[in-house]
């Protein structure tokens, strides 16, 4: 695999994806971010078996492929790179070489096949809501969400779509 992306788009996607990386786990693959460049877009995926995040990164795919890299190490490397295009290249031994200008990092990876993929959600009903409206809906109801996870049922919000109306 070989991809080229701007540092800023990589950093943004990795920092968003880090929110679904568990701090402690018995499954080391969950500490990784899956870089999937097997289609015509570059996807970054993380999953802690409760929360999964997938982001799409703008960039160029020169060679298709997939690899799972330690998310925190990848974040620290990208954060310290100069503001320029970053190249991530992998080999058959699952080693990733990250280069940007004169900087070059080599980190071990894991097979993307071992990664816990996100479930495919079939959409029965769809509704488009503006970002502002959704933010306001959440702002007006967030006070009722439990602050701790002792009662998991109370840590989220319920959205219902009926007759093309979101409640």
Named regions from a protein language model:
Residues 1-167:
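Structural preference for solvent-exposed beta-strand-turn elements
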